[in-house]
């Protein structure tokens, strides 16, 4: 097949552009084009000394026609190749055993047969038909198979489209559930963060107000102690005086000493005591609720994990482990409080507790949510690190429920860690 195509390509190069047949006695004229000697001679018969090339229309000399031996040899080689090709094809269509042309096809053996083979005992009882008839029969079978396969192709395309649709529906559901989980846990994280900020801000406010009350208490009692000390000093001085001087104004001094009374103000206002008691009660309630919720969530998660991993094979577990590892690395830098590009960490709102109104902390909105001024949105870490005195911090540490603080912090940490395990979009 390949050699036949090669011969045909070569034959195209030795075609006379006048007679459109293989060059016979090829000659070349001045412009370089090749023609049959007979064809180009007929063109030049009507002219005197010059004639125009049939291809490029260039004027060439009539007596400049010259034989092209190389082209003649090429034509001979091509003709020899063509003869060999024809002989090869003829040989292929000839029975190698009897040297006769093939005319029949044996259905039983799938072989071509000549007249002699057809009558031989090897094929006489077989289903034998003419080559053209057998080919026509198989053409029909081929056409039937084409139609069957085309119908299967059509059905396969439909099945594939349905499968792709199911995959799309599945991935859409997965994405929806992922966004649902992220949204719900983000809301939970926000609620816990707001609750934590409020509780810490309230307890710090109580500590701050208690410290201010202590300062007021000291400011009220210190002058009285100074007055008492002066009275004692004056009596001691009188006691060491001579009799005459001792008796001078003695009644006034004694009367003043007897009339002295220590005015003891309330160290901590009852309103602050009440608010602290309410805060502690709220802290106990939250701690208990969080513990119950945490225990239930952990128990349910354990059951869910067991169901999820039970049907996984080794490859599934491997892909799961890689996914967890990659997601953890990807999301670690996006956790709240992680380092930014400049090496600084994200902090909460600044602490401006000195300008906080005394009772605006406990206003309630129409939606039932507790509202509080931005100046009180300070975390414990911010309070202890932004200019609070040692007395302020000590009072705050005593008032704050360590159990509540630990519970809230544990939940916020757990939620952030959970975010790192959820694949991102």
UniProtKB/Swiss-Prot annotation:
Cited InterPro entries: TRIM/RBCC (IPR050143), Znf_B-box (IPR000315), Znf_B-box_chordata (IPR020457), Znf_RING (IPR001841), Znf_RING/FYVE/PHD (IPR013083), Znf_RING_CS (IPR017907)
Residues forming coiled coils: 126-162, 270-307
Q: Can you summarize the PTM annotation of this record? A: Auto-ubiquitinated (in vitro).
Complex and partners: May form oligomers. Interacts with isoform p52shc of SHC1.
| A single Gene Ontology CC term | mitochondrion
Indicate where this protein is primarily found.
cytoplasm
Instruction: Give the keywords, sorted.
Output: Antiviral defense, Coiled coil, Cytoplasm, Immunity, Inflammatory response, Innate immunity, Metal-binding, Mitochondrion, Transferase, Ubl conjugation, Ubl conjugation pathway, Zinc, Zinc-finger
Q: What is this protein called?
A: E3 ubiquitin-protein ligase TRIM31
Please list the GO terms describing molecular function: transcription coactivator activity; ubiquitin protein ligase activity; zinc ion binding
| Gene giving rise to this polypeptide | TRIM31
Tissues showing expression = Up-regulated in gastric adenocarcinomas.
Q: Name one GO biological process term.
A: inflammatory response
Which pathway is this protein assigned to?
Protein modification; protein ubiquitination
Tell me the function of this protein. Answer: E3 ubiquitin-protein ligase that acts as a regulator of antiviral immune response and inflammation by mediating ubiquitination of substrates. Acts as a regulator of innate immune defense against viruses by mediating 'Lys-63'-linked ubiquitination of MAVS, promoting MAVS polymerization and formation of three-stranded helical filaments on mitochondria. Acts as a negative regulator of the NLRP3 inflammasome by catalyzing 'Lys-48'-linked ubiquitination of NLRP3, leading to its degradation. Regulator of Src-induced anchorage independent cell growth.
SMART domains given for it?
BBOX, RING
Q: Where is the composition biased (Low complexity)?
A: 336-360
